Design a protein with these regions (language model features):
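Long, charge-rich alpha-helical interaction segments
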Residues: 213-298
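Terminal low-complexity segments of carbohydrate-biosynthetic enzymes
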Residues: 269, 277-294, 302, 324, ...
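Transmembrane alpha-helical segments and their cytosolic interface motifs
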Residues: 297-329
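Soluble catalytic domains of membrane acyltransferases
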Residues: 6-203, 321-431
């Protein structure tokens, strides 16, 4: 029997959930979840993550929080009835934005009531306060939706159990390349019930602004945060150049990035003109190295003949596995390649690649199983199927390895580019 309420148990959802979670994990080379102890267990929980990588943000949050969670998504995705039904099945509610017009915004009142009911029944609700995605290590202005939902819930049952907003930071190794890394960090929760009492005001608008300020602060502390202004590109490029020598856990990498950015900001305050000039130079360097097809990672180590020779041997050694992977996963990466060319918003490309993987797991996988056991002895069939499992991500990993390998060779023939990078780093250290 289908569930009547979005937060109720559903057998189909429970069967699909572990399959989705497994595919999400396999879509990243490394994954990490930190701060789960910060999720309260004594009240209603609203999760508030940053929004930088379209649907993948919701998927990594879903996998990171094993508890059943209801999500909010932009309302225009629900315009088609079939899509709306699928969204309901996936526990996703429509969230109307101000840009959708006042008449539509009023519909949020109905959604708000469902959110409050969901929270009252102990099911977490996840909403992206920024309202729209932006592939950048920064934050946009937080919308009012998350605070209105929290205040409505607090008004209804805050006297029985507290309402919390948990800030969440999502960090990716790359926004656009498939099979990178993902880090989810839960921060210290804001006890909205206690926060409202401390304000001693009754006007909702007066409550929202302090909450917005506090949540923005806590969210920015959970990611590699850079103010999104004209110096953003220069600061991010400089941060990457200075962090190349550090190879730690995902959490340590993020903390190291934050330390470097803090140092950059301090130097900017002391010597604004010199730092402005350096950041402009860093932004120019980034454009030049991209134009020459040189990866930022090629600057991490000296590109000696020995290093290139070893990489050549590695590429040749892995080539048979790559050919097998390319053939075995051809229907998947072929469709993915077509979709990635069609999609204009680069931030959606990883979502498309994941979608193909998930669809392949549910369709192409069973077909391969049926064919393998139809034409091969069972032990050969099992062996072949086990070999096929990692082929999709390995195909992308090998392509990335070759991309960086070619980049290393290009850099070895571009000493001026290496000198350009060294000049930026040395200048920074003297400021």
């Amino acid at each position: 029997m289908a569930r009547q309420k979005i937060y109720q148990k559903d057998l189909g959802y429970d069967i699909l959930r572990p399959i989705v979670d497994w595919n999400v994990k396999q879509s990243y080379r490394r994954v990490a979840v930190k701060g789960q102890e910060n999720i309260p267990t004594d009240g209603a929980v609203i999760l508030a993550p940053n929004h930088c990588n379209t649907l993948m943000d919701a998927l990594v949050i879903l996998r990171a929080n094993k508890k059943e969670t209801v999500f909010g998504a932009r309302a225009d995705m629900f315009n088609i009835k079939l899509v709306a039904k699928i969204m309901f099945f996936l526990r996703i509610l429509p969230m109307v934005r101000q840009r959708d017009g006042l008449r539509n915004v009023l519909k949020n009142k109905d959604t708000e009531e469902i959110i409050v009911e969901t929270l009252e029944h102990g099911v977490p609700f996840c909403i992206f306060p920024e309202g729209k995605h932006r592939a950048a290590h920064s934050l946009q202005v937080l919308g009012k939706g998350v605070f209105r939902a929290a205040l409505s819930a607090n008004a209804k049952f805050g006297d029985k159990k507290p309402v919390y907003i948990v800030p969440v930071g999502i960090e990716y190794g790359d926004y656009f390349r498939y099979h990178s890394t993902s880090l989810v960090t839960y921060g210290k929760a804001i006890n909205v019930t206690e926060f409202v009492k401390s304000l001693e005001v009754e006007n909702e608008a007066q409550m929202i602004e302090p909450l917005r300020k506090e949540l923005t602060k806590r969210m920015s502390e959970l990611i590699t945060y850079i103010d999104y202004n004209e110096d953003y590109d220069g600061k991010w490029t400089l941060t990457r150049l200075l962090s190349l020598r550090y190879k730690n856990t995902l959490e340590e990498q993020m903390r190291n990035n934050r330390r470097i950015i803090s140092e950059i900001e301090q130097k900017y305050e002391k010597a604004p003109e010199a730092m402005k000039s350096l950041l402009d130079k860093a932004a120019k360097f980034d454009k030049v190295r991209r134009k020459k097809g040189v990866s930022i990672y090629s600057f991490a180590a000296k590109n000696s003949f020995t290093r290139i020779f070893v990489k050549t041997l590695a590429a040749l050694t892995m080539l048979p596995a790559y050919i097998f992977s390319a053939i075995a996963s051809l229907p998947l990466w072929g469709i993915s390649a077509i979709l990635r060319k069609i999609i204009k918003d680069r931030a959606f490309k990883n979502t498309a690649t994941f979608g193909v993987r998930l669809a392949g797991c549910l369709t192409y996988g069973p077909i391969c199983i049926a064919l393998a056991f139809s034409f091969l002895p069972w032990f050969y069939a099992i062996f072949l199927l086990l070999l096929m499992i990692p082929t999709y991500p390995f195909f992308y990993d090998y392509n990335e390895f070759i991309r960086r390998f070619v980049s290393d060779i290009r850099l070895s023939f571009n000493p001026d580019l290496k000198k350009f990078k060294d000049d930026i780093v040395q200048t920074y250290r003297t400021l």
